[in-house]
Amino acid sequence: MTQQRPPLEIRLCGPRGFCAGVDRAIQIVVLALKKYGAPVYVRHEIVHNRYVVEGLQARGAIFVEELDEIPAAHRNQPVVFSAHGVPKSVPADAEAKNLFYLDATCPLVSKVHKQAMRHQRLGRHVILIGHSGHPEVIGTMGQLPDGAVTLIETVEDAHTCHFDDEDNLGFVTQTTLSVDDTAGIIKELQARFPNLAAPAAESICYATTNRQDAVRAAAPGCDLFLIVGAPNSSNSKRLVEVAEKAGARMSMLVQRAEDIEWEQIGDISVVGLSAGASAPEIIVDEIIDAFKAHFDVKIELAETTVETENFLVNREIRDVELTVKDMAFVNGEHRVVGISKLMQGK
């Protein structure tokens, strides 16, 4: 006699997973491989997800941390800069080495670069709210001369920082931060420096805000909340924090279904599921299938908004056709079809 599986509700968040900037960055590498052939070099992980990186490596991408790692024999092959953005010195170095490069910096990160440079042009010292060592922070700080930017990571930093000219300050933020935590830091800075200039537009990107809002709405009543993402993915780690603060009994970050420790989960009846902006949909499907092996699963789509943003790839590769098959290694079947199947229980 077959043992009956316990019932389980999975609240599948929407939006989740790839944002337009991540989609664009991966497409740039895929299209470069189609147009120019392998190898295509990529400086730093194109996005913070090993599954994506390994999938691109299998297609002929080679990942390096510095341009000096590109062999002289391959200097005629393209190099792609990651979605996180790079300091100004990197494209300058590429040009000095006569390298052909494609910049996959997210357009919303580029917007933050422009906001920081505008502050400086107006004579302001720039305050960057972000996490030390994150590639996006390194790239943003690298848009301005040494000493022109001060990094603030916490409310305590905001409370203790000092500046020579407190009347000429402007701030920008890393795009992937927690909306709530950033608000606290900005509030402290504005209390201490009343003339602090804000950026012309919100720095935290729409995708970060949307994913956090969806998790926040779905978390109450969840016994467990899983976020698909990498340990070095800032926006994924923030989603884990948001789930905990919003009422999930337990939340955790997983990269693959094999990371789930079933014996530690215990007695659960409601699970929340979302994915960071660099996590592919195919892993979300994998995790749902893993739960179906243990439970009688019912999918509830917990959608707070629908994203329609789309960013163009670089002009040099717009003549190359991108097919569903080209992106199947991360998307699986077309997303709309996938959601339809999930709602039908596959």
Swiss-Prot record:
| UniProt cross-references to InterPro entries, sorted A to Z | LytB/IspH
- Which residues are the active-site ones? 136
Q: What class of enzyme is it?
A: oxidoreductase
Keyword list, A-Z: 4Fe-4S, Iron, Iron-sulfur, Isoprene biosynthesis, Metal-binding, Oxidoreductase
UniProt binding sites for [4Fe-4S] cluster: 19, 106, 205
Q: How is the cofactor bound?
A: Binds 1 [4Fe-4S] cluster per subunit.
* A Pfam family that the UniProt record links to this protein: LYTB
Q: Which residues bind (2E)-4-hydroxy-3-methylbut-2-enyl diphosphate?
A: 48, 84, 134, 175, 233-235, 278
Molecular function in Gene Ontology: 4 iron, 4 sulfur cluster binding; 4-hydroxy-3-methylbut-2-enyl diphosphate reductase activity; metal ion binding
Look up the record and give one Gene Ontology term from the biological process aspect.
Answer: isopentenyl diphosphate biosynthetic process, methylerythritol 4-phosphate pathway
Q: Which cofactor does it need?
A: [4Fe-4S] cluster
Which sites bind dimethylallyl diphosphate? 48, 84, 134, 233-235, 278
- What is this enzyme's catalytic activity, as reactions? isopentenyl diphosphate + 2 oxidized [2Fe-2S]-[ferredoxin] + H2O = (2E)-4-hydroxy-3-methylbut-2-enyl diphosphate + 2 reduced [2Fe-2S]-[ferredoxin] + 2 H(+); dimethylallyl diphosphate + 2 oxidized [2Fe-2S]-[ferredoxin] + H2O = (2E)-4-hydroxy-3-methylbut-2-enyl diphosphate + 2 reduced [2Fe-2S]-[ferredoxin] + 2 H(+)
Report the EC code(s) recorded for this entry: 1.17.7.4
* Amino acids binding isopentenyl diphosphate: 48, 84, 134, 233-235, 278
Pathway per its UniProt entry is: Isoprenoid biosynthesis; dimethylallyl diphosphate biosynthesis; dimethylallyl diphosphate from (2E)-4-hydroxy-3-methylbutenyl diphosphate: step 1/1; Isoprenoid biosynthesis; isopentenyl diphosphate biosynthesis via DXP pathway; isopentenyl diphosphate from 1-deoxy-D-xylulose 5-phosphate: step 6/6
Of which family is this protein a member?
Belongs to the IspH family.
Main function: Catalyzes the conversion of 1-hydroxy-2-methyl-2-(E)-butenyl 4-diphosphate (HMBPP) into a mixture of isopentenyl diphosphate (IPP) and dimethylallyl diphosphate (DMAPP). Acts in the terminal step of the DOXP/MEP pathway for isoprenoid precursor biosynthesis.
Protein known as: 4-hydroxy-3-methylbut-2-enyl diphosphate reductase
